[in-house]
Amino acid sequence: MSQALTLARPYGRAAFAIAREGGTFAPWSDALAFSAQVAGDPRVAALLLNPALGQEQAVTLLAPPQAGEDYLCFLGVLADAQRLSLLPEVAGLYEHLRAEAEHVVKATVTSAAAMSQTELDTIAAALKKRFGRDVDITTAVDASLIGGAVIDTGDVVIDGSLKGKLARLQSSLAH
């Protein structure tokens, strides 16, 4: 486990608790995604380390225009603790906790070519049956897979790609 994730964990849990209490999961997701993207930019990361940048200015820089008072206070706490650079990890932890609370499995389906909606619906139905939860699918295309697909749910990876099958075949022949 990386040190950044360890340091970000209490902030991710705090953000989740505030959003759950206010019933504002989606706005917090949007705000954290915005702030994480901004904080993840190398130029902004360097700026955040500059002592000439005040905490209020840092919060203003990282807050989305529609941010509520709770979110601005949350960013202020991160700024006070000099943890604004952890926003990408905080956002990831928050999304994981949100998915758990909403009984949703987030899956990334990477295929060699674009998949039809029918194929994605079939995969979603199979994953829902396997995990007993709703499925939120994100797609990606990677031509190096040659054919097939790789399904990544975070905890479980199902490699049905030709590239993966060839690698397993090569490994078994080598032993």
Swiss-Prot record:
Transport listed as a keyword: yes
Subunit composition and interactions: F-type ATPases have 2 components, F(1) - the catalytic core - and F(0) - the membrane proton channel. F(1) has five subunits: alpha(3), beta(3), gamma(1), delta(1), epsilon(1). F(0) has three main subunits: a(1), b(2) and c(10-14). The alpha and beta chains form an alternating ring which encloses part of the gamma chain. F(1) is attached to F(0) by a central stalk formed by the gamma and epsilon chains, while a peripheral stalk is formed by the delta and b chains.
Organism for this UniProt entry: Xanthomonas oryzae pv. oryzae (strain PXO99A)
Annotated InterPro entries: ATP_synth_OSCP/delta_N_sf, ATPase_OSCP/dsu
Role of this protein: F(1)F(0) ATP synthase produces ATP from ADP in the presence of a proton or sodium gradient. F-type ATPases consist of two structural domains, F(1) containing the extramembraneous catalytic core and F(0) containing the membrane proton channel, linked together by a central stalk and a peripheral stalk. During catalysis, ATP synthesis in the catalytic domain of F(1) is coupled via a rotary mechanism of the central stalk subunits to proton translocation. This protein is part of the stalk that links CF(0) to CF(1). It either transmits conformational changes from CF(0) to CF(1) or is implicated in proton conduction.
Alphabetical list of Pfam families matching this protein: OSCP
Protein name, entry field: ATP synthase subunit delta
Family membership noted in the UniProt record: Belongs to the ATPase delta chain family.
GO cellular component: plasma membrane; proton-transporting ATP synthase complex
Compartment list: Cell inner membrane
Swiss-Prot/TrEMBL keywords: ATP synthesis, Cell inner membrane, Cell membrane, CF(1), Hydrogen ion transport, Ion transport, Membrane, Transport
Gene3D superfamilies attached to this UniProt entry: N-terminal domain of the delta subunit of the F1F0-ATP synthase
SUPFAM superfamilies for this protein: N-terminal domain of the delta subunit of the F1F0-ATP synthase (SSF47928)
A molecular function (GO) term: proton-transporting ATP synthase activity, rotational mechanism
Annotated membrane topology: Peripheral membrane protein
